[in-house]
Amino acid sequence: GTDESAEDYVAGIASLVAVDDYTVEITLNFDAGLSAWQYRIAQAPFLNETYWSQFATSREDLLAASGADAPVASAFVYDKVEQGAFYTWNYDPNTMWFGGDTTIYKSGTVVEWDNGVAPAISQSFGDTSGDSFTYTSGPYVGTVEFTLYGDQDAAYLAFQNGEVDFVLNPLGVKRNLFDQLSRVPGVETTANLGNGMRYMAFNTRVFPGSNKAFRQAVACISDKEFVLNNVLQGVAVNMDGQMPEALTAWVAPVTGVLADCAGLSAEERWGKSVEILQAGGWTASDWGSHPGGADRAVAPTGVKGPNGETPPSDMLLYAPGAGYDPLRSTMSLFIADWMQQLGFDVTARPTGFSVIVDKVFTPENCEDWYFYMLGWGLSAFPDHPEAFFASYNDTCEGGYNTPGFNNAEFDALVGEFNKAKTVAEAIALSQQMEAILFEEMPYLVLFNVPTLEVYRNNVSFPFTDVLDGLTGTGGG
């Protein structure tokens, strides 16, 4: 229904009608902004009813159908499929998907597609002024073979031996392998800014993560850039806010404790963090001292929260182990040590990726952890702060808000953001939301990793400078 006050009201699609062979009319029962309409519902895939209805007798039958013979919105159709070994695409001579010019600008796109078969499209998006380049869509090959490998090592060994031309890998190539493969004759390389982030989450449902001064103090003492530049040799890019640096218009000015503590020495960071705790009502039997330089601080003793609470002993910071991700593993060791220098008993615990996910994303476990490190891959339209921090998305209720962040002002801005009809309006609201997150610190955002990729020089891409790499685009 459309009555938002009704007990059984659910925001969503009210009706969906196929008007003709190329047009679908969608009616919504809510005021949808960019995030719900243009970047979600309007981009949903459609399945051909004539073909798929024969399998729609039950969920099990539908999932069991291979789909190899299904009509596709592509210039290619499935040809051969060898389970666990390879499959091939062949050019479909009856396709309507070929040709057409696409012109890319700094902040906009123009498409002129009219091949005499498909419905003609002439559209422009964003700012279509300034420098640009144009490419004509193919396909330019008749067959594409996808060879399946059991792991990345086997895939890149096949690449090195010339058996494959490109490896589809959303994580890209690790730096040492990238450097090794770049020296192989006939190999081209590309490096792109990633559309993601690695982060540390505080559980704001339980003490001490429930205390804002504690979260701010940890954020202040954590000299991420020291670790990234001096220990990890610059292989990752420091990230303070929710927006990757490539999304230049969306990146908000850094404010709050991260701005206050930027550029401070280790001694100054420690002193500032102690001041934050004291201003927040924390007490200690002895506040300790810092000898200066790179030496560790003499940690405070007898630290208690504003209401006399004693922080738990043996708190764990879960992070992927060095074998899975040496960057987060290393960062976790430093941040746990910095928390120890503030008088908190915290240990970095290397933990399997899936174990961390089960621990922090399961509703029944939502209060059974203190800190963890993981990462997110993000979408083209950056509406992720709503998913990660809106109170109605709390993981205790099955959502992605693992910290349990609950802030009425933030929620109100989320409501406005969800209705934003223009990118400019959405950016302004997003940056207001970011300012709250800089103050409240449910996440300590850590860094972003460039996407490194390699391909054989017999493959030609229209462009290789693309957000998050070639694998996640039409280039891959």
Where are these regions (language model features)?
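Extracellular/periplasmic solute-recognition and catalytic clefts
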Residues: 2-6, 15-16, 79-88, 130-134, ...
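Second-shell loop/turn segments in exported
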Residues: 12-14, 77, 143-148, 201-207, ...
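Aromatic- and charge-enriched surface segment that lines or borders ligand/interaction sites
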Residues: 1-2, 25-27, 208-210, 215-217
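Short, well-ordered beta-strand elements
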Residues: 24-26, 74-76, 87, 141-147, ...
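Surface-exposed binding/hinge segments that line
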Residues: 2-56, 69-82, 466
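Short helices/loops that flank or line small-molecule/ion binding pockets
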Residues: 153-164, 212-213, 333-342, 355-369
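Append "and occasionally in soluble cytosolic enzymes with long acidic Gly/Pro-rich linkers
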Residues: 85-90, 96-99, 112, 118-133, ...
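Detector for C-terminal structural segments
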Residues: 82-87, 93, 191, 198, ...
